Swiss-Prot record:
GO molecular function, one term: polyprenyldihydroxybenzoate methyltransferase activity
Binding site for S-adenosyl-L-methionine: 36, 55, 76, 120
The organism of origin for this protein: Pseudomonas aeruginosa (strain LESB58)
Its biological purpose: O-methyltransferase that catalyzes the 2 O-methylation steps in the ubiquinone biosynthetic pathway.
Protein name: Ubiquinone biosynthesis O-methyltransferase
Pathway: Cofactor biosynthesis; ubiquinone biosynthesis
CDD domains named among the record's database cross-references: AdoMet_MTases
Enzyme Commission number(s) of this protein: 2.1.1.222, 2.1.1.64
GO biological process, one term: methylation
Enzyme class of the recorded protein, top EC level: transferase
Membership in a protein family: Belongs to the methyltransferase superfamily. UbiG/COQ3 family.
PANTHER family attached to this UniProt entry: METHYLTRANSFERASE (PTHR43464), UBIQUINONE BIOSYNTHESIS O-METHYLTRANSFERASE, MITOCHONDRIAL (PTHR43464:SF19)
Gene3D superfamilies the UniProt entry points to: Vaccinia Virus protein VP39
NCBIfam families per the UniProt record, alphabetical: UbiG
Length: 232
């Protein structure tokens, strides 16, 4: 059975044409992208690395990593986001290889081929996130690094990521997130360890609605990123 939620795919298909509009529903992704790329680059040294971006969407993260000197493959199951990614690539001239394929299928085709694997803001949109993490472990080379990000599952996360972001501040379209699919750091850590990945670091992303700025912080109550590593 495919680890794909077609309703989730449809949500982003409908919005895909606005993916690179920095004032659209994707503004939060554009705003946090430099923070995330810097954090990944500091830990993985992207230049010259072979990188796989799982759930790449319209290519915001994929292009940024390629601009740091990485050889990037971006995969997604949404046709429209991938079409937008390829179109933007023509404008930007940034080389990324985009493919419509699941992480699990990619792991069958290219096991142990990547120095770095990223899977950001995607795990909360699939039926079986642990399956994706197992695929990440298979895809990364021994000693390679896997970076994951998602949203914590607690009352504060519901208040900020759903009520605040979707209804009050209207940073995201209503229905973007399903609170039941949010993932606690303890769950993400357990799935990573079960897959054979060692958790190396965790960092939170916080948003100040007054300044409209994001920053990295030790507060992992809402948005957070995790660095993991496969044994050498």
């Amino acid at each position: 059975m495919s680890n794909v939620d077609h309703a989730e795919i449809a949500k982003f298909e409908a919005l895909a044409h606005r993916w690179w509009d920095r004032e659209s529903e994707f503004k939060p992704l554009h705003d946090i992208n430099p923070l995330r790329v810097n954090w990944i680059d500091e830990r993985a040294g992207l230049a010259g690395k072979k990188v796989l971006d799982i759930g790449c969407g319209g290519g915001i993260l994929s292009e940024a990593m390629a601009q740091r000197g990485a050889s990037v493959t971006g995969i997604d199951m949404g046709e429209a986001p991938l079409a937008v990614a390829r179109l933007h690539q023509l404008e930007s001239g940034v080389a990324v290889d985009y493919r419509q394929i699941t992480a699990e299928q990619m792991a069958e085709e290219m096991p142990g081929q990547f120095d770095v694997v990223t899977c950001l803001e995607m795990l909360e949109h699939v039926p079986d996130p642990a399956s994706v993490i197992r695929a990440c472990h298979r895809l990364v080379k021994p000693g390679g690094q896997v970076f994951l990000s998602t949203i914590n599952r607690n009352p504060k996360a519901y208040l900020f990521a759903v009520i605040g972001a979707e209804y009050i501040l209207q940073l995201l379209p209503r229905g973007t997130h399903d609170f039941r699919k949010f993932i606690r750091p303890s769950e993400l850590g357990a799935w990573s360890r079960e897959a054979g990945l060692e958790v190396k670091d965790i960092i939170g992303l916080t948003y100040n609605p007054l300044t409209k700025h994001y920053k990295l912080a030790n507060d992992v109550d809402v948005n957070y990123m995790v660095q993991t590593q496969r044994e050498a």
